[in-house]
């Protein structure tokens, strides 16, 4: 009877080194258990860091290192690549707005690789600076990525 009135303690998890692969596996598990109406972006903090307290039960740990996740594409980056997560979100939002405005992809006409045209995005006032890397658009889902299609 006494157990009914005892407060349940939150489980504490050790802080340890977690690889990117382990983190991705934990996120996959977390995603599979999410209700359909709850987006994965609930796992991403405002500064694009990952909410480790939500993932701790899947990792059985709290990662030492800081990982970042794009809210737009859900790509994951380590601390040295934080700028990529920020630039991906920035550019993906602009690409989505461009498609909404023009019903076209913001690429140079005839480009077989579908490289994002920063010029077209700037011309429409959708971006104010050009990210230092090239992004490519997937023709199926219109998500951008860093991989040049073959």
Residue ranges, per PLM feature:
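Short acidic linear motifs
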Residues: 1-150
